[in-house]
Amino acid sequence: MKTLCLLFAVLCLVTWTQARGAEVEENLTAQDGEVDIAGDNGDVQLTLNTDDFESFTLKTLTLGHPRVKRHSCVCRRICAARQVRKGRCSRRRRICCLY
């Protein structure tokens, strides 16, 4: 019975973790104007740990175009209509990327 309860608890934890995947934040620092996200599944919201770069290149495969490996991003208060909100910059601005 204990094994069954433990198995059920693990299953619930895995399901809960997957459901919260869209809320996961990843803190990154831009280096040479580029941010590299190797394992981004598209649900990660980023927090950029720098105020130095007003614009940068986001290296990921998951902003809607699987063949595009780099996206041009900027830190703005409001994202334009053709931009995807990918997180926030450290000055209460959003990371807005062209898709």
From Swiss-Prot:
Proregion positions: 22-68
Its tissue distribution reads:
Lowly expressed in spleen, and expressed at lower levels in kidney and lung.
**Which N-terminal residues, if any, form the signal peptide?**
1-21
Entry keyword Lipoprotein: no
Cellular-component GO terms for this entry: extracellular region
Q: Which UniProt keywords apply?
A: Antibiotic, Antimicrobial, Cleavage on pair of basic residues, Defensin, Disulfide bond, Secreted, Signal
Q: According to its UniProt record, where is this protein mainly located?
A: secreted
Task: List the disulfide bonds in this chain.
Answer: 73-97, 75-89, 79-96
Task: Tell me where it resides.
Answer: Secreted
Key word Zinc present: no
Q: Name one GO biological process term.
A: defense response to bacterium
* Similarity section: Belongs to the alpha-defensin family.
User: Any idea what job this protein has?
Assistant: Has antimicrobial activity.
Q: What is this protein called?
A: Defensin-A4
This protein's species is: Ornithorhynchus anatinus (Duckbill platypus)
Kindly list the organism's lineage: Eukaryota, Metazoa, Chordata, Craniata, Vertebrata
